UniProtKB/Swiss-Prot annotation:
Lineage: Eukaryota, Viridiplantae, Streptophyta, Embryophyta, Tracheophyta
Protein name: NAD(P)H-quinone oxidoreductase subunit 6, chloroplastic
Record text on subunit structure and interactions: NDH is composed of at least 16 different subunits, 5 of which are encoded in the nucleus.
Topology in membrane: Multi-pass membrane protein
Entry annotated with the keyword Iron-sulfur: no
Cellular component annotations (GO), alphabetically ordered: chloroplast thylakoid membrane
Annotated catalysed reactions: a plastoquinone + NADH + (n+1) H(+)(in) = a plastoquinol + NAD(+) + n H(+)(out); a plastoquinone + NADPH + (n+1) H(+)(in) = a plastoquinol + NADP(+) + n H(+)(out)
Cited InterPro entries: NAD(P)H-Q_Oxidoreduct_6, NADH_UbQ/plastoQ_OxRdtase_su6, Nuo/plastoQ_OxRdtase_6_NuoJ
Domain of life: Eukaryota
This protein's UniProt keywords: Chloroplast, Membrane, NAD, NADP, Plastid, Plastoquinone, Quinone, Thylakoid, Translocase, Transmembrane, Transmembrane helix, Transport
Length: 176
C-alpha cells in the first residue's frame, strides 16, 4: 500500500498491539470459545500485516485458509466436544504411548541432525526454463508458482509431508 510513513507506522503499532492482546487472550481466557475467537483476531491482524507489506496473495491465503477454515474448524470442534469427558479423566500413559513418543522423538532428532549435517549450498534442485525466464510474468500468482516448483521445492514437499502426517493423525484420532 502506498501509505505515508507516519500512517504506516501507526497502523503497524495498532496491528502489533492487536496481535499481542489477541495472543494474550488465546492464552489467558478460560473459555475455549473465546480463545478461538481471539485466535481468529490474531490471524486477521497477521493478514493485515501482509496487506501492509504489499503481499496481497499471502494475505488472501491467510484469511481463507487460517481464519476461514482452520479457526472455524477449531470452533466447531470445541463446540461439539463434551467438556466433562476430558476434564476429569487423566489417564496414565500406556506402553504404546511411550513407544510412540520414543519413535517420534527419534525421527525428529534424526531429521534435525540430517538437516544440520547436509551441505545445502550449491545444490541445484531444478533448472528454470528459458521460456519462463524470457516471459514478463504478469502477476504475483505466477511468480509464486514458479518459485514453488523451482527454488522452494524442498520446503514445499516437506510441508506436504507434514500435512499428510497431520491428516493421518486426525483420521486415527477420529476413529477412536
Amino acid at each position: 500500500m502506498g501509505l505515508p510513513g507516519p500512517i504506516h507506522d501507526i497502523l503497524l503499532v495498532f496491528l502489533g498491539s492487536g496481535i499481542v492482546l489477541g495472543s494474550l487472550g488465546v492464552i489467558l481466557l478460560t473459555n475455549t470459545i473465546y480463545s478461538a475467537f481471539s485466535l481468529g483476531f490474531v490471524l486477521v491482524c497477521i493478514s493485515l500485516f501482509y496487506i501492509l507489506s504489499n503481499s496481497y496473495f499471502v494475505a488472501a491465503a491467510q484469511l481463507l485458509i487460517y481464519v476461514g477454515a482452520i479457526n472455524v474448524l477449531i470452533i466447531f470442534a470445541v463446540m461439539f466436544m463434551k467438556g466433562s469427558e476430558y476434564s476429569n479423566d487423566f489417564s496414565i500413559w500406556t506402553v504404546g504411548d511411550g513407544v510412540t513418543s520414543l519413535v517420534c522423538t527419534s525421527i525428529f532428532f534424526s531429521l534435525i541432525t540430517t538437516i544440520l549435517d547436509t551441505s545445502w549450498y550449491g545444490i541445484i534442485w531444478t533448472t528454470r526454463s528459458n521460456q519462463i525466464m524470457e516471459q514478463d510474468l504478469l502477476s504475483n500468482v505466477q511468480q509464486i508458482g514458479i518459485h514453488l516448483v523451482t527454488d522452494f521445492i524442498l520446503p514445499f514437499e516437506l510441508i506436504s509431508i507434514v500435512l499428510l502426517v497431520a491428516l493421518i493423525g486426525a483420521i486415527a484420532m477420529a476413529r477412536q
